Amino acid sequence: MSELVAYGTEVSSVFQLIGNLENDITKSIAWALARCPEFLKAVINEVMSLEIDAQNVRIKYQEFEKNKGITDLEITDDTSFYIIIEAKRGWILPGAEQLALYSQRRNIIESPVSHKSIISMSECSEDYANAYLPFKVINDIPVNHLSWKRIYELA
């Protein structure tokens, strides 16, 4: 089973994730990804078109890097893919400054994987996000979007 770490501590129970704020929603998604290998595989396949071994995936929640912000989620298997997810509540998309900071984070830059992506998650449809996200690619890293509706469909 994948490992879920929040604030440096392993999350072992869904009850650690109760709440309805933006961060609570993100924690719940992270927990579901870590505990449901088929859901994790479906999400990775959706955004990267990759078949993965869920056993080898690490999911990090609220990962801090000095001068580069705090990511909502970072998901990697350290061999084929590295994803940074920025989740928003409502019809909101991450801005250019936030995406630029994430594209410069040490972990994604130094990762030897061949598939990297920054993913926006919100209630915005994919069509809306494709029209209004500030970048399609930043620092050679593709920027994509998954709506909460699509996440629900994948689950």
Q: Predicted segment positions?
A:
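Acidic metal-coordinating catalytic centers involved in nucleic-acid phosphodiester chemistry
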Residues: 2, 6, 66-69, 75-155
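Generic low-complexity, intrinsically disordered sequence content enriched
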Residues: 8, 18-21, 125
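Glycine- and acidic
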Residues: 10-15, 86-87
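Acidic-basic catalytic patches of nuclease active cores, encompassing PD-(D/E)XK
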Residues: 15-56
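Active-site metal-binding core of divalent-cation-utilizing nuclease and nuclease-like domains
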Residues: 46-78
